[in-house]
């Protein structure tokens, strides 16, 4: 009788342990680019880790590494943790980037800036802070390209700003300038960063 009761107790105990609900120690984390944080999975089953967008943040055995500015989700089996990656460099304000927008929509978004020039295919504005000018190019009435201009002295800080947000796709160098082609973390936008004696130009187009 004693052995039978002990066996039943053991079976009940094992059943209780086996039914333990899996859990993740955090469901949302915020990191700066290049920071890491360890997530802990608790459960009886083996954990498989994955990231919805490794270009934003990757995970290796629970250690999350922030790669570029953006938001993604880390999965631990069927559990999830939202990861928000924030920038360290915020010295520049990018232009309006909703490609396909009308000229009136762009004007509305740039209402806080002074219009510099306008024609059928272009809008330019005086910038603020580290940005000298903004430019918008239209094709068939729809926004096709956005750009901003800065002084050459801003090239290093602008490079840091862009590398936190975008992936380098290609680069080339001539006697007068350097040209870097980057792509957004969602692979939907190309960015061209040009540096020369004239200063710095950053141009954005739809991929």
Short names for language-model regions:
Residues 1-2:
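Bacterial N-terminal signal peptides that target proteins for export
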Residues 10-13:
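C-terminal motif of bacterial Sec signal peptides marking the signal peptidase cleavage site
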Residues 15-36, 54-55, 68-69, 77-164, ...:
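Short helix/turn-capping signatures at newly exposed starts of structured segments
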Residues 60-73:
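Extracellular/luminal low-complexity segments enriched in Ser/Thr/Pro
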């Amino acid at each position: 009788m004693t052995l039978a009761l002990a066996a039943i107790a053991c079976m009940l105990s094992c059943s209780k342990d086996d039914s333990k609900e899996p859990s993740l120690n955090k469901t949302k984390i915020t990191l700066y680019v290049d920071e890491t944080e360890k997530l802990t999975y608790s459960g009886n089953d083996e954990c498989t880790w994955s990231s919805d967008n490794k270009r934003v943040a990757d995970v290796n055995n629970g250690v999350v590494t922030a790669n570029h500015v953006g938001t993604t989700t880390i999965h631990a089996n069927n559990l999830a943790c939202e990861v928000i990656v924030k920038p360290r460099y915020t010295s520049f304000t990018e232009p309006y980037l909703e490609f396909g927008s009308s000229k009136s929509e762009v004007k509305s978004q740039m209402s806080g800036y002074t219009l510099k020039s306008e024609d059928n295919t272009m809008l330019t504005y005086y910038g603020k802070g580290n940005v000298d000018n903004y430019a918008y190019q239209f094709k068939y009435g729809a926004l096709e390209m956005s750009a901003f201009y800065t002084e050459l002295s801003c090239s290093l800080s602008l490079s840091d700003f862009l590398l936190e947000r975008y992936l380098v796709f290609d680069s080339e160098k001539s006697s007068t300038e350097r040209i870097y082609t980057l792509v957004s973390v969602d692979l939907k936008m190309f960015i061209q960063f040009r540096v020369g004696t004239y200063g710095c130009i950053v141009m954005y187009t739809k991929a």
